[in-house]
UniProtKB/Swiss-Prot annotation:
Belongs to the glycosyl hydrolase 2 family. HAMAP family: Beta_gal. Its cofactor is Mg(2+); Na(+). This is Beta-galactosidase. It comes from Escherichia coli O157:H7. Substrate binds at residues 103, 202, 462, 538-541, 605, 1000. GO terms for cellular component: beta-galactosidase complex. The keyword Repeat does not apply.
Amino acid sequence: MTMITDSLAVVLQRRDWENPGVTQLNRLAAHPPFASWRNSEEARTNRPSQQLRSLNGEWQFVWFPAPEAVPESWLECDLPDADTVVVPSNWQMHGYDAPIYTNVTYPITVNPPFVPTENPTGCYSLTFNVDESWLQEGQTRIIFDGVNSAFHLWCNGRWVGYGQDSRLLSEFDLSAFLRAGENRLAVMVLRWSDGSYLEDQDMWRMSGIFRDVSLLHKPTTQISDFHVATLFNDDFSRAVLEAEVQMYGELRDELRVTVSLWQGETQVASGTAPFGGEIIDERGGYADRVTLGLNVENPKLWSAEIPNIYRAVVELHTADGTLIEAEACDVGFREVRIENGLLLLNGKPLLIRGVNRHEHHPLHGQVMDEQTMVQDILLMKQNNFNAVRCSHYPNHPLWYTLCDRYGLYVVDEANIETHGMVPMNRLTDDPRWLPAMSERVTRMVQRDRNHPSVIIWSLGNESGHGANHDALYRWIKSVDPSRPVQYEGGGADTSATDIICPMYARVDEDQPFPAVPKWSIKKWLSLPGEMRPLILCEYAHAMGNSLGGFAKYWQAFRQYPRLQGGFVWDLVDQSLIKYDENGNPWSAYGGDFGDTPNDRQFCMNGLVFADRTPHPALTEAKHQQQFFQFRLSGRTIEVTSEYLFRHSDNELLHWTVALDGKPLASGEVPLDVAPQGKQVIELPELPRLESTGQLWLTVHVVQPNATAWSEAGHISAWQQWRLAENLSVTLPSAPHAIPQLTTSETDFCIELDNKRWQFNRQSGFLSQMWIGDKKQLLTPLRDQFTRAPLDNDIGVSEATRIDPNAWVERWKAAGHYQAEAALLQCTADTLADAVLITTVHAWQHQGKTLFISRKTYRIDGSGQMAITVDVEVASDTPHPARIGLTCQLAQVAERVNWLGLGPQENYPDRLTAACFDRWDLPLSDMYTPYVFPSENGLRCGTRELNYGPHQWRGDFQFNISRYSQQQLMETSHRHLLHAEEGTWLNIDGFHMGIGGDDSWSPSVSAEFQLSAGRYHYQLVWCQK
């Protein structure tokens, strides 16, 4: 044990937080979570242990601008100005100091290992009682599951120890410091330490005791570590549970270890042995360790599909059976290996349907409770995710237990990222930083290796490739050969990774960056000598309105066996709740707390909002990742299961044939599909169609019974096919009255019954419509070629740092946003049964023509206005965002009804999850409330739109809301938007894709760009 004087002044003088060689003082060795049961039945059933006591709750807290400002008296008693805060928490979420959001740039001046003298310091204290029985025998430990970023600990005025690495536990022996009755803890937490240079993750930088604190009482002679592993024969019909147990204390001949394996109430196997292992070298073996092997016949295998859980109970007792203590853990029988270029689980190649997940809560910062963790797991399971990467640090210990039990594959990642270093491997190639890196990797493995859900270890994130990585890779492979190791840094395919694990590599496009080229994922597989599997550690950057092109990845994953999936970036938007002057909550991002440096809204890349409300993109991910695939041939549907281990036993296939959204026939068939098997379903003959319209077949896979992660009726998969467009003859309608044209110096006015249309002869636009005496338009109907930029359109552009390659900057530079219409033609003609208005506009900027738009408006006796639009795009202008029409309608109706793709927002490169049907939603649901306002709410493939008294027909895309594109473009936060008068309608003949391979470079695939020189579309606008 390190002995340091109790004086605060001496501790401050040592400056342990600026010494990379000091990662801890007096911290106990890492191990799996302990509870020290004194009853084996309680250990088996995982009941609360009387030896494990939570210290969560209200603590006294004082904040200081630097550790030197802390008075010595604080070690002995609470300060008069102390506040009360809840532990666990981040102090920034209680109004102390400010959270800082930055992605790459360090929030402090880069001068490792030194940190600023202005180093915000939180002083926590707690008074608690200890029963004398805990002091008479045994060892009392204190466990801090997470403290950011470093801390010194005192107990009853005496210095105990020091710890850093904010994402792993720090555990200390308090036995020598405690007294019976009242005791006082004092914890001095520093915001910055040399460890901060290894924690440069893309996240909010927060501080404090943000995970659980607990006391644990262990006997003097105790279990100090145990490790379980599962071994199999070739066909997995027999297994061995291998348990290695280590003890601490007096080694007596009478000591025994019993390991029992349970499945529910049934004991499957048991074994007992004294301590002492096999001979290791010429000096012998470990006297304080023992390894037992338990044979298990026909084990029920663990997988994310069927997470069969056993329970292993480890008992330390005397030869006569007197129990000293018991520890326990969940066990999953499973094998992970790489063979022939494939990552295998239980002998079958995995397809990773993964997502990255930060520990984030909009109200509580980085504090995770069980409810939030379960909510995240249910979201993943319900949306067909089977894997999660703990980006970029070990998670709360409970997370892994929940993943074991619900069934998720976990990449457990060390708390190492040096993204802001130049070069990035400046620290990871420096032997002075090897001790700190070693602690972060080895202690993660020692804590989490008993969890079956952990199938891959990760050495960290974005830290270049250094010799320290190679050393730690070899250590893991030596200590735990049962799992692969991955690491992306240095090019994603270095000697420190068993898996090619690039981030944001594209399907077909190479990105030949210097030193670390990012090949297309297809090309990577074919590089000479390369035989590793490829799993993208990050892909499909889900920032704002994104995830375009997601289907392209999944087509490749299913086509090439060694492309074994990836992890979407990421699950949850990292916005935080702030309150305005009236106490109303709003969502904040980088810079909103006065934090500098900051990376603005780049913290919001989630498939769900911070409150876990889904983004529309989540449905696209769910659909592409679904475990059932479908093929239609005539009236035969072939259903293929992508489950590797699960026979469908809770699925019904519902099918519906509908004509323009009106069901004609339907049925349901139970699915009985073996793992990786097929089922063929024959549909009945369909009735002869008498009506015109689009005929669609839709299938849904429904779970009739609830599961651990879904309610009854959950839809797990779906597909839709367009069967035909019925073109039966429509009888001519009766003759109508002929609309009347009136021409004035300023307008063309067309009247029919109680309707009027007015075209301004100076602008050439439809300037007004009347139904009776009610005006229908607040702004004219005009061309629209722009959109409120998406995050993907903006890229890395900022007001002070323009990226000329970003779509929005190209559009701005070309004048798309500033273009004005020059009228070239505006004529009116009376036909035999209609009035025809013809207009031609040149959309210009600074004398240059960007677009020419030719439109005809044919208003006939039925009151229909048929609009035909032809647009020419200048060859030297950037591809436009959209080609369409926009206006502000006077009405605000409650609901929107349309026949087209829905119900969720969809875009040309993100619409595979949308279904063609007749949809009806509240107007408010047509707007997607992205925290950073942008273009949103598009619905593609629309044949008919009904809103208020109006109907539009054709083949178009539309969005409709109370917010104009201009307001969306000019507003920084959604809570600052105000509902405008009337309703804004955008009808597009064509709309560019949204992209999403990443959010910092143009990523819209060529096939979804508006690259043609001419465009033609048409629609009919009438009143119902």
